[in-house]
Amino acid sequence: MPSPYMDRPGAAVRLMVPDEDISFTDRIKGPQTVNLARHCGDFIVRRGDGAWSYQLAVVVDDALMGVTEVMRGDDLLLSAAQQIYLYRLLGFDPPEFAHVPLVCNEQGIRLSKRDRSLSMEYLRENHTPEEVLGIAAHRAGLIPSPFPISLSALLQLKV
């Protein structure tokens, strides 16, 4: 039931979630079960500024684009349960998920675009594609040291 406060300026819209388990098998992390109410709680689907939330936008966008596999950082593992709930609520089949370890620098701080941690320009000028893949695979814990590796060899790794 819509809240009488939904039309107030600056009001965010939350989706009330049931006390329900969402189970899925992550390609990297294996079987997962998340209780929406306990682990996530109700979550915003429309922000106070009127923009749609990331959770809703990514589900609708991926569903309409026919995305069947999603790979992202393991810091977003819990949000997979929210998204699976949204997929089902909207009548879409959820994709398969693979959550990989975050890529961190030597101090253990996550590399991010927001912090301008590393630029593609720098990588192109200073490394071969195989070196970049090797560095990324090593930082993600996929190979023991940052040696150059081809994309085909990387895809053959058993994670």
PLM regions and their residue ranges:
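Active-site cores that bind ATP or allylic diphosphates and position pyrophosphate for catalysis
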Residues: 1-112, 119-123, 144
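Conserved catalytic-core subdomain
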Residues: 107-159
